[in-house]
Amino acid sequence: HKEEILHTFPFPVEKADELLAFCVAENKRISEIVYENEKTMRSEEEIHNELLRIWDTMLECMYIGCHSEGILPGGLNVRRRAYDMHKNLIGVLPYEDPYSWLQIIRQTEVKFRQILKWVSCFALAVNEVNASLGRVVTAPTNGSAGVIPAVLMYYLVIENHKAGEKEIKQFLMVAGEIGSIFKKGATISAAMGGCQAEIGVSSAMAAAASNQVFGGSPQQ
């Protein structure tokens, strides 16, 4: 069945060097290769809607995590940390939903020493939503679900205030392809490969996706 699916793709990819070879031969970026493959399975509208649905879920997850305080369920008396981190970073600026929140963060002056705090806050927020049985995007797993949304949010609110749906879709397509290569050739399961099989893969996915939106080459 897998061979049949790969055969229908214009650019069948099992390994990273195959992906790079297609990029070089076709003079395309990774997101463009992924997009052409996706079009064999769903319409352009479906691709657009599904990618933005993923991002909406990620954004909502960060929003909920940053605005929920108290003790996490489970009986270990673990206190939520994202709420206080976020409160100290954003101050008293007004907003009413995840998207107005994103715009407000864009308007704040983010000092260099605060960048890592913001990224950590976003990632912790997702982890805490996961720990409290909330909805997260497995990217590539529940345990490492905070990395992709945190890095993409960093890009949108700190690095590129003009970025929008185009960059979000490119980021997610590249991240997904890199995660898929790991899943085909190794594992994304911490139970099988140790913690680095989760956080290591999600970090590689985020790094490759960041390279795309920052204008890097497929080789990079």
Where are these regions (language model features)?
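Surface-exposed loop/turn and secondary-structure junction residues enriched for glycine/proline
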Residues: 8-9, 14, 33, 139-140, ...
